[in-house]
A protein has these predicted regions:
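NAD(P)+-binding Rossmann beta1-loop-alpha1 motif at the extreme N-terminus of oxidoreductases
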Residues: 1-55, 62, 191-193
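Short pre-catalytic strand/loop immediately N-terminal to key active-site residues, enriched for Gly-Thr
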Residues: 4, 116, 165-170, 222-227
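Internal alpha-helical scaffold of NAD(P)-dependent oxidoreductase catalytic cores
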Residues: 103, 107-114, 130-167, 180-217
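Short acidic-hydrophobic, aromatic-tinged amphipathic segments that line or gate anion-handling sites
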Residues: 52-57, 158-160
Length: 268
């Protein structure tokens, strides 16, 4: 029996698959992937030696102990119906947005499958993701730890209560879009000052990357790090004062609030 099965190898599924193999967390020989076309199956098998590839989801469910469901939300229900007879004693890991634990539990009712709901974000595509994990109460500690290791291979993970998922989506799932807007705005301003566009984008992106790294590695409060950049009567405090005047903090918090509320509505 294979250790891990992956149904769906699109952008996110592919990042998870390649990340866990490239990191050495699991050997390609211990993984099976299911793709929707023979052409894609052949291409992936050629790309990753030792990986077993199929177009038959039922066959994968029969062969794999833990199954990552990386298909689009609108087809997950049909997929679960099709493999329901094969998932007894399997641990299912869903990354489908909007599918709550109650919805997943209802779909696998009558089986002994156990469940995890997982929410990665797009920086996982470059190995710098942040993934939230919610476990079903009946899931074993060993299965939780093993699943967490899969997503640790593409960034960082946090095991949280499902009631916090809407907040997680606001602060991490959707937030790359806010940060991209910030980088774009910073680059535009730099171009106005005469800096070439490619250089401006690189400078802005590196500033965000370096600042995030300082928060994570120094352990200092972001406010303290901000204060350390602001010299008395200097350039930075002028910029900070303008951001405060324009309601920068409130805009970010309001954006996150509507994001979380939209997530709650979508899960009903």
């Amino acid at each position: 029996m294979k250790k891990i099965g992956m149904i769906g190898v699109g952008n996110m599924g592919g990042a998870i698959l390649r990340g866990m193999i490239a990191s050495g967390y699991v050997a390609a020989e211990d993984v099976m992937a299911c793709l929707h076309s023979e052409e894609k199956r052949q291409a992936l098998a050629a790309e990753i030696p030792g990986l077993t590839c199929t177009t038959d989801a039922k066959a994968l469910a029969q062969e794999c102990r833990m199954i990552v469901l990386a298909v689009k939300p609108q087809v997950l229900g049909e997929l679960l119906d099709s493999i329901k007879g094969e998932i007894n004693d399997r641990a299912l890991v869903s990354i489908a947005a909007g599918w709550t634990m109650d919805m997943l539990t209802s779909k696998v009712a009558g089986t002994t499958a156990t469940l995890l709901r997982v929410m990665p974000n797009t920086p996982a595509l470059v190995g710098a993701g942040m993934t939230a994990i919610c476990r079903q109460a009946t899931l074993s500690a060993a299965d939780l730890a093993y699943a967490q290791g899969i997503f640790d291979a593409i960034g960082e993970t946090a095991v949280i209560d499902e009631k916090l998922f809407d907040g997680f989506i606001a602060v991490s799932g959707s937030s790359p879009a806010y940060i991209f807007m910030l980088i774009e705005a910073m680059a535009d301003a730099a171009v106005r000052e005469g800096i070439r566009r490619p250089d401006a984008v690189k400078m802005a992106a590196q500033a965000v990357l370096g600042s995030a790294k300082m928060v994570l590695e120094t352990g200092k409060h972001p406010g303290q790090l901000k204060d350390e950049v602001c010299s008395p009567a200097g350039t930075t405090i002028e910029a900070v004062a303008m951001l405060e005047k324009r309601g920068f903090r409130a805009a970010v918090q309001d954006a996150m609030a509507v994001c979380a509320e939209k997530s709650r509505q979508m899960s009903k």
